[in-house]
C-alpha cells in the first residue's frame, strides 16, 4: 500500500535528518543579528529552531507534517502553517529580515515542469525567477535555498544547514551555485564536523546568506581555521563550494600522508558499509512512498550479484593474492 509523504518524512526523520540539536541551533543563532523582531523557518518541524528565540520575537513557520506543525503552534507568538513550502507561498507579500532553516537533505520535489497544479507550479517558478535553471527534480536542496532567498528581505540575513554534496555536485546545481556566487549571496560557509543529530553523526555545511551583495568573496570556515576567498578563485574551482577545497588543505594532506595504509583501507571499507546501509534505508522509504519505483528487492539482488561476482573471483585459484597485493 502506498504510504503518505508524512510517513516518508518520518522515516527520514528517524534517520536523524530533521531535528536540529540544541548546540547546533545556538551555533546557527550566533550567525544572525543579536536583536531580532521576527524570524521565519520554511521547514520548521516541531519548531525547534524557532524556540531558541524569545517570546517577544514574532515567529513564522511552515511544516509538511501536520502533527509536527501542531506541536510548533504551541510556541508563543507564532504563526504556523501545515503544507509544502516549495509548492505554496503561505506568507504572500511578506519578506523576512531573519530566516533560519534545517531543510531535509536530498529529497525529491515537484518543480514547475512536473507540477500538475497551476498555482503550485507558479510559486515554484517564482522562487527560481532569473535563475539559469531549476534544482533537479530528485534533489530539492537548492530549491529550499531559492525559496529562502525569495522570502529574505533586501537587508536580511539567513542561516541554513545543507548536506555537503550540494556544495560540489555538477550540472544544474553547479549552474545555480555559479549564479548565486555571482550575486554575492554567500557571506560565510562553515563545515560542521560530526554534527550530532538524534541517532547519527554527519558532516554538514552551515550557510550564512544575504539577498545579494557587490562583495562576492566568501569566508570559508573549518573549526578554528578560516579563509576569505575571492570570486576569481571560486570561479577557477568551477564554483565548488566545498570548505576543504579552500581551507585546511595542508592539514588534510598531512592526515592522509601519516595514516597507516592498512588502517586507511579498513576505514574506507567501514565508510562504504555505513553509506550503503543508509542508502538502502532511504531507498526502501522511497519505494514505500512511490510505488512507481522498482521494488527494493531488485536493488538488493543487484547488490548481491556484485558481491557474488567478487566472491567468485577471489575464490578462483588464478586470483589468489596476499594482503600486500591488495594494498
Q: What residue spans do the PLM features occupy?
A:
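Long recognition/docking surfaces used for binding and targeting
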Residues: 1-8
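Conserved S-adenosyl-L-methionine
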Residues: 8-101, 106-108, 117, 155, ...
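Short alpha-helix boundary/capping motifs
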Residues: 2, 18, 22, 62, ...
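A conserved structural/catalytic subdomain of Rossmann-like adenosyl-cofactor enzymes
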Residues: 93, 97-327
Amino acid at each position: 500500500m502506498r504510504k503518505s509523504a508524512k510517513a516518508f518524512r518520518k522515516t527520514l526523520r528517524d534517520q536523524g535528518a530533521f531535528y536540529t540539536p540544541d548546540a547546533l541551533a545556538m551555533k546557527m543563532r550566533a550567525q544572525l543579528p543579536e536583536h531580532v523582531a521576527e524570524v521565519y523557518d520554511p521547514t520548521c518541524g516541531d519548531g525547534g529552531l524557532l524556540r531558541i528565540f524569545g517570546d517577544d520575537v514574532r515567529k513564522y513557520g511552515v511544516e509538511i507534517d501536520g502533527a509536527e506543525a501542531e506541536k510548533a503552534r504551541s510556541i508563543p507568538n507564532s504563526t504556523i502553517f501545515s503544507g509544502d513550502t516549495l509548492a505554496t507561498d503561505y506568507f504572500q507579500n511578506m519578506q523576512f529580515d531573519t530566516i533560519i532553516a534545517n531543510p531535509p537533505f536530498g529529497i525529491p520535489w515537484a518543480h514547475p515542469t512536473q507540477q500538475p497544479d497551476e498555482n503550485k507550479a507558479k510559486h515554484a517558478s517564482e522562487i527560481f525567477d532569473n535563475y539559469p535553471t531549476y534544482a533537479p527534480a530528485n534533489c530539492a536542496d537548492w530549491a529550499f535555498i531559492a525559496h529562502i532567498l525569495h522570502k529574505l528581505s533586501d537587508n536580511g540575513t539567513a542561516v541554513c544547514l545543507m548536506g555537503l554534496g550540494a556544495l560540489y555536485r555538477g550540472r544544474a546545481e553547479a549552474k545555480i551555485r555559479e549564479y548565486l556566487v555571482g550575486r554575492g549571496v554567500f557571506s560565510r560557509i562553515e563545515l560542521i564536523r560530526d554534527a550530532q543529530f538524534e541517532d547519527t553523526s554527519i558532516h554538514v555545511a552551515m550557510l550564512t546568506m544575504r539577498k545579494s551583495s557587490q562583495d562576492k568573496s566568501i569566508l570559508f570556515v573549518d573549526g578554528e581555521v578560516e579563509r576569505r576567498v575571492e570570486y576569481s578563485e571560486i570561479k577557477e574551482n568551477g564554483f565548488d563550494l566545498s570548505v576543504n577545497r579552500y581551507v585546511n588543505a595542508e592539514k588534510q594532506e598531512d592526515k592522509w600522508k601519516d595514516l597507516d595504509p592498512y588502517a586507511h583501507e579498513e576505514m574506507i571499507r567501514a565508510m562504504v558499509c555505513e553509506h550503503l546501509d543508509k542508502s538502502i534505508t532511504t531507498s526502501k522509504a522511497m519505494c514505500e512512498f512511490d510505488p512507481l519505483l522498482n521494488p527494493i528487492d531488485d536493488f538488493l539482488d543487484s547488490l548481491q550479484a556484485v558481491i557474488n561476482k567478487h566472491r567468485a573471483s577471489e575464490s578462483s585459484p588464478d586470483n589468489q593474492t596476499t594482503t600486500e597485493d591488495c594494498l
